[in-house]
Amino acid sequence: MVTGPDMLWLVITSGIACFFMAFVTGANDIANTFSTSIGSKAISIKKALIVAFFFEALGASLLGGTVTDSIRSKIINFQVFYDTPEFLMLGMCCALMGATVWLAVATRAGLPVSTTHSIIGALLGFGLATGNMKSIKWEKINNIVISWLAAPILAGTCSAIAFTVLRMLILRKKNSFEIIKKMYWFLIFLITLPFSVFLIFHNPIVINTQCKMKKDGKVIVSSPCYIEDWSAAHSFYASIICILLSSLLTAIGSFVIYIIYNKRINNYNLKKKIFCEELADIEKNPQNNFCAINNSSLNSVASNETQLTQAHNNTSNGTKQNQVGNGTKSNNNNVLVLPGDKNVKSQQDDSKTNGTQKTGSVEAYHVVHIKDNGSEDKSHENMLKKNLDKVTNMNENNNNSNKNNNSNKNNNSNKNNNSNKNNNSNNGNSNEGNGKGGDPKNMENVIIENFDPQTEIVFSSLQIISAILGVVAQSANDTANAIGPFAAVFNTYNNGIRGKIKVQWYILLFGGLSMSLGLSIMGYRVIKTVGMKLIKITPARGFTIELISGLVVLFFSICGIPLSSTHCAVSSVIGLGLVEAKMNADNKRHARKSMDKDIIQVDKDKSFTLTEKIKYPFSFLNTSCVNLRLFRTVFLSWILTVVFSATVTAGIYSFAAYSPSYIMKMQTV
């Protein structure tokens, strides 16, 4: 046991460093969990913080001990420091400092880096700075390095396959909404089952009672009772408990999700009926989203409103309408249709006949009911004007941007196509949203395949469950990054370096709360990068990313192997983006022309077609929907993580351990 005031300062300093390490871990790694949910608008930032605060602390307290032991005892060889435990404590403190410095720099730049790589690199720097190569368990490092490569590849591949299967079985079906209503409970079960297995079979919680346990292949009766050892000795009963727990969580989750998605669909339908489909999305998506659509789902969203209007307008001899102000009044005097009936084609024909053509503006589609006395019902007038003001501001901004784009095109008209693409990429004017040349801040404008809005709403509700899984999985894995070195210092001070390894629950809880605080204050920077700049994320895509990355992290955590949850999340995003459907040349030209307008107007039958039947997931990869330029920067930061953390830690440790004053003091003891 290392006690006394001389070493107490190391415990206090390590505790402070642990707090800042957990803080930046939450701002970087935990932000990855909610980046896809926030990027797809499935959950607000306030609700995300509430969910993260609770489940991060819960996951860290219940499940964080398994990987924490891997971080602190499977990388550094404690036997080398049996005679000098104070140097072990100093090295762990320096490792926390070195990793924190790099994570703070990366988070400030909005780069999603690996906290696991940071702390392992810092521990390697500490081990190398001691000058004793035996202080590092190199055989364990090999397994960790393999997981660094295997986990991202596995996450990206599984994400691509899962989205392809989901798109084929549900999203592209005409009755996708009816299918997902019947199947969403199964998706919830896929989320809860691995969590239940981890909770029962790999739970580091200790109960102060006597029980039958299995340790080192032998069944013994001992006290205290370790839950994971009890599960190993009673595998059948533990499996039954897992299934029952998963079923219970699925039932509760299904009930909650049913209420949430029905409420969201009702709100969406209400907005659609009042303001039309385009205006219904303005509040949710302030920026314009230019998408090619593979079915008539988005056009059919307003079918009820269109049928209502046509029912009043149709007569036996055709449709006769009288112009009333800026609107169009039908013959039965019960409905007033503001400019822009959903029948875009007939409206364009009328404009051509009158010698006028409207372009570059958004028109409001709204059914206004007329009272029996002929006066207009103005109950929704204020709300309509509010949204029309939003559209007007959008038009003004887009008209200015269109002028700039046109001037840029005129300046580049004498150059060849390749130089045009390069210049456009430099100006951030890539209409196709190509990741090679597109503006990283404008991935919301890429051309991707859209699905039924009501189906997407169900997936946006499911993202709440998948985000919770991601938080629990990352808390189980990432808590170790901050808590592991501090736990080594704390236990060495209290129990000695030869004492039994034990991670107290309050230390894990302290780490979980610190990470939640970091997410609340600085997490928005990484959320923007992963959730909004790499690819365009919709609820169905976000759910797939969160589900796969969470399952991969849980799998490696069950094995007790520390891995990068950041690499899993980003790799899932990239893997899904690479299997986005490709558009043919005609649709690309149509999209380019439509990009000059505020909203793309498409026909139902010609809106989206594939160049051919693509054999997924690896026959043809689509890089136009992935911001490869930003991913290249992120990938380089991954490589730099280990080197930077190791260098900074080695420098701090060398200065602290080998400074003359400290050595002289140690020699006089």
Curated annotation (Swiss-Prot):
Main location: membrane
Record InterPro entries: Phos_transporter
CC annotations in GO: plasma membrane
Molecular function per GO: phosphate transmembrane transporter activity; symporter activity
Pfam family, one: PHO4
Comp. bias (Polar residues): 311-335
Transmembrane intervals: 7-27, 48-68, 87-107, 109-129, 144-164, 187-207, 240-260, 503-523, 543-563, 633-653
GO BP field: phosphate ion transmembrane transport
Region listing for Disordered, in residue ranges: 311-364, 392-444
Membrane topology, from the record: Multi-pass membrane protein
Keywords carried by this UniProt record: Cell membrane, Membrane, Phosphate transport, Symport, Transmembrane, Transmembrane helix, Transport
Extracellular topological domain: 1-6, 69-86, 130-143, 208-239, 524-542, 654-669
Spans within the Cytoplasmic topological domain: 28-47, 108, 165-186, 261-502, 564-632
Basic and acidic residues bias (residue ranges): 342-352
Localization terms from the record: Cell membrane
Compositionally biased intervals (Low complexity): 395-433
Catalytic activity: 2 Na(+)(out) + phosphate(out) = 2 Na(+)(in) + phosphate(in)
Family recorded in the similarity comment: Belongs to the inorganic phosphate transporter (PiT) (TC 2.A.20) family.
Annotated function: Sodium-phosphate symporter which preferentially transports the monovalent form of phosphate with a stoichiometry of two sodium ions per phosphate ion.
Protein's UniProt name: Sodium-dependent phosphate transporter
